[in-house]
A protein has these predicted regions:
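Switch/communication elements of ASCE P-loop NTPase nucleotide-binding domains
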Residues: 1-115
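Acidic, divalent-metal-binding catalytic cores of TOPRIM
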Residues: 73, 82-270
Length: 270
């Protein structure tokens, strides 16, 4: 059936999709083994392939595929993901991830996209609250002489401070080294809220003190500007051309901690 689709399709990868579509509606009891199915396909096709593989499995087939495409990874089904790693002497290991709780599955499905799923393919990750930190940390890496992409480091925007504990759990289950950067949101001019103190304590407990970099009281405070209006743009302008000696110390510390974690893992390219 797939061979017939290959003969009619304009390109091999389009043929792969057409052939699998036909199989998903008619075939059961078959083992499919596919290497790097994402090659030469647009990101939209990656997401569609993931759903197509699910349809095949629901008909009683088994689907095995290798991938370096975050769009093909489903963090809502961690128990279906097997991580293949290689140590410094070339020994390969395969580890199946433990599933996450049902309540968290829904949250992960909502919060993760292909970019966030890159953390599964990373040597290390920096977990940050939002867009401001995500767009400015690469400038800190650059000013210190590093490129996070070259180092295979993912800067993961967690969609808010309250989601950071969930991302910590995902990193731990995937055995991805990580560093957390978050605001304390505790200001001397006002009484600290119990909720903020509890969240800060939860993050510190889950991540560990050595993996946690707290910005006092927030990003604006350590970067030297005030106000929330257009914060990402202002932060970008503030740090885009900063020299090493002008960088905020907490951000430098976060970058150096992440680099140290990343360099403990074997890179997939050099």
């Amino acid at each position: 059936m797939i061979q017939a689709a290959l003969a009619r399709a304009p390109a091999p990868r389009v043929a792969l999709i057409r052939g699998l579509e036909a199989c998903a509606s008619e075939i059961s009891g078959v083992v499919f083994a596919i290497e790097e199915p994402e090659l030469f396909l647009a990101p939209h096709a990656h997401r569609y392939l993931r759903r197509l593989f699910r349809r095949l499995a629901e008909r009683g087939n088994q689907v095995f595929f290798t991938t370096h495409a975050p769009g093909l990874l489903s963090v809502a089904a961690l128990d279906e993901v097997n991580l293949v790693t290689r140590d410094e002497i070339g020994v390969t290991a395969v580890e199946r991830l433990r599933p996450i709780d049902v309540d968290d599955s829904f949250r992960v499905m909502c919060e993760f996209d292909a970019e966030r799923s890159e953390l599964f393919l990373s040597r290390a990750a920096v977990l940050v609250e939002g867009l401001t930190e995500k767009i400015t940390l690469p400038f800190v890496f650059s000013a210190l002489g590093y490129d996070p992409d070259r180092e295979q480091i993912s800067i993961v925007e967690c969609g808010g401070k309250s989601n950071i504990p969930l991302f910590i759990e995902i990193c731990r289950r995937a055995r991805v080294p990580f560093v957390v950067v978050h605001d304390s949101d505790l200001r001397p001019e006002r009484e600290p809220s119990e909720a903020e103190q509890k969240l800060n304590a939860l993050i510190r407990r889950k991540a560990g003190a050595r993996r946690t970099v707290v910005l006092e009281p927030d990003f604006e405070g350590i970067a030297g500007f005030r106000g929330k209006k257009k914060k990402p743009e202002r932060a970008w302008l503030h740090l885009a051309n900063a020299r090493p000696e002008e960088l905020p110390e907490p951000l430098v510390r976060a970058v150096r901690l992440t680099l140290a974690s990343a360099h403990q893992r074997e890179p997939s390219y050099s």
